[in-house]
Amino acid sequence: MPTIQQLVRKGRATFLKKGKAPALDSCPQKRGVCVRVYTTTPKKPNSAMRKVARVRLTNSKEVNVYIPGEGHNLQEHSIVLVRGGRVKDLPGVRYHIVRGALDTAGVSGRMQRRSKYGAKFPKTGTGKTKAVPTKNKK
């Protein structure tokens, strides 16, 4: 334990908290260009082919970014919007692509949580149709 005189001379070291998405430079999102689009396998208990892209951001930093949803239209040189948010079973992937923004298409056929995947409200053919409840006959 330090003496009071040592604390007067030196003081206590304050630890700086490390950010979770340092490549975004304190911005909510950043634009970037896909350098490589590929699939990779997750960590041990899980099994899948996760869609990932290597993106060069406008601040010239390169990051690994997860592509959420089923199917995508991304390829090399696609312009994407990147937000923070890691993928727990993919080491080194700390960012997500925003679906439905810039060159990234929304998930087609998505009915629930559409705003998270950039899916528009599905259009019905003949105006507004109401579901008629059926009565149970005993």
UniProtKB/Swiss-Prot annotation:
Keywords: Methylation, Ribonucleoprotein, Ribosomal protein, RNA-binding, rRNA-binding, tRNA-binding. One of its GO terms (biological process) is translation. InterPro entries: NA-bd_OB-fold (IPR012340), Ribosomal_uS12 (IPR006032), Ribosomal_uS12_bac (IPR005679). One of its GO terms (cellular component) is small ribosomal subunit. Pfam families: Ribosom_S12_S23. The keyword Chaperone does not apply. It comes from the Bacteria. Coiled coil: none annotated. One of its GO terms (molecular function) is rRNA binding. SUPFAM superfamilies: Nucleic acid-binding proteins. Residues 107-138 are annotated as: Disordered. The modification 3-methylthioaspartic acid is found at D89. With S4 and S5 plays an important role in translational accuracy. Belongs to the universal ribosomal protein uS12 family. NCBIfam families: rpsL_bact. Part of the 30S ribosomal subunit. Contacts proteins S8 and S17. May interact with IF1 in the 30S initiation complex. This is Small ribosomal subunit protein uS12. It comes from Azobacteroides pseudotrichonymphae genomovar. CFP2.
